[in-house]
Design a protein with these regions (language model features):
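Hydrophobic membrane-insertion alpha-helices, especially the h-region
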Residues: 10-23
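Conserved SGNH/GDSL esterase-like catalytic core that processes O-acyl groups on lipids
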Residues: 79-168
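Generic structural signal for well-ordered alpha-helices
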Residues: 169-173, 214
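Catalytic His-Asp segment of secreted/periplasmic serine-dependent ester chemistry enzymes
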Residues: 26, 193-273
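N-terminal, intrinsically disordered, polar/charged segments of Gram-positive cell-envelope systems
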Residues: 26-88
C-alpha cells in the first residue's frame, strides 16, 4: 500500500515538473520571439535610415556656378576697321613713322615723328617733329586724340639696357596719359632689322634685343587702355629677322610695303564709342 502511494506521489511530482518545464519553455520561446521581433524592427529602422542617407547622397544638390556673371564686361576684342578710324589718331615714333606718314594710307591722321629719335628723346630732349616743327608736348597739348599709336626703340636697342628702356618708355607713357587721359594707347611692337643689317652693324642694331623689348612691352599692356600690337610679326622672316624683301636698307620698310603695316592696323583695332 505504502509503495503504491510513493509511486503515485513520485508520478505526480514528475508530471508537475514536466508541466513546469513546458511552461518555462513556452515563456522562453515567447521572450526569444519578442526579442527577435524587436531586433528585426531595429535592423529595419537602421536600414531605413541608411537608405535615407544614401538617397540624400544621390540627390543632386545645386552647386555654385563656376561661370562668371554675364554682368561683368569682357575685355574688348580687336577687330577690323576702315581708314576713317585713324582720322582722330596720332602716330608717334622714329624714322619708321616718318615713312608711315609719307607712304602709308592714313592721310588724315596726325604725326609726331623724327629720324634717329629714341625713347629718352621724347620728353628729356625737346625733339621736333620733322614736318610740323612741334615738340611732342605741344603736339599732345593742342588737341585731344581718341587713339595714340607709338613705335620706338630700335635706334638704341643694342646700347641701352632693357631695364633702362623700360623705365624710359613707361615714364613716357605716363606723360602721354597725363596729356591724353581719354585716349587708347596702342603700343606697336618695334620692327627689327634684317640679318645682314645686324651683322654689318652689331654695335647699333640687335634683333635679339628688339625681341626682348617687344616681349617686355607685351607683358605690360592691359589690352584696354594700353594695347599691344605685334606689327613686327607681319614682316618677320623664318629666323625672326626683318624680312629682306620688305627692306632694301635692312632698317626701313620699302615705300611699297607700308601698306602691309596699314593693313595690319586696320585689322587689329578696338571699338571706340
Amino acid at each position: 500500500m505504502k509503495k503504491t502511494i510513493k509511486i503515485i506521489i513520485i508520478t505526480l511530482i514528475i508530471a508537475i515538473a514536466l508541466e513546469l518545464s513546458a511552461i518555462v519553455a513556452i515563456k522562453a520561446y515567447h521572450l526569444v520571439n519578442e526579442a527577435t521581433k524587436t531586433d528585426a524592427k531595429e535592423v529595419t529602422h537602421k536600414n531605413d535610415k541608411k537608405q535615407a542617407k544614401n538617397t540624400d547622397k544621390n540627390v543632386d544638390i545645386p552647386k555654385p556656378s563656376s561661370k562668371i556673371s554675364s554682368d561683368i564686361p569682357e575685355k574688348p576684342v580687336l577687330g577690323p576697321v576702315d581708314a576713317t578710324y585713324f582720322d582722330d589718331a596720332v602716330f608717334l615714333g622714329d624714322s619708321r613713322t616718318v615713312g608711315l606718314r609719307a607712304f602709308g594710307d592714313f592721310h588724315n591722321s596726325s604725326y609726331f615723328a623724327k629720324t634717329g629719335i629714341s625713347v629718352n628723346s621724347f620728353f628729356m630732349y625737346p625733339a621736333l617733329d620733322e614736318e610740323t616743327g612741334l615738340t611732342l608736348t605741344q603736339t599732345l597739348s593742342y588737341k585731344q586724340y581718341k587713339k595714340i599709336y607709338i613705335m620706338i626703340g630700335v635706334n638704341d636697342a643694342a646700347l641701352v639696357p632693357l631695364e633702362t628702356f623700360e623705365t624710359q618708355f613707361f615714364d613716357a607713357i605716363r606723360e602721354i596719359q597725363l596729356l591724353q587721359p581719354e585716349a587708347i594707347i596702342y603700343v606697336q611692337s618695334i620692327l627689327g632689322v634684317t640679318k645682314n643689317k645686324e651683322l654689318s652693324d652689331p654695335y647699333h642694331y640687335s634683333n635679339e634685343r628688339v625681341v626682348e623689348r617687344n616681349n617686355l612691352l607685351k607683358s605690360k599692356c592691359d589690352g584696354e587702355k594700353l594695347v599691344y600690337l605685334d606689327v613686327f610679326s607681319a614682316f618677320t622672316d623664318a629666323e625672326g629677322y626683318l624680312n629682306q624683301f620688305n627692306s632694301s636698307d635692312g632698317l626701313h620698310l620699302n615705300s611699297s610695303d607700308y601698306d602691309i603695316w596699314c593693313d595690319y592696323l586696320t585689322q587689329h583695332a578696338l571699338p571706340v564709342n
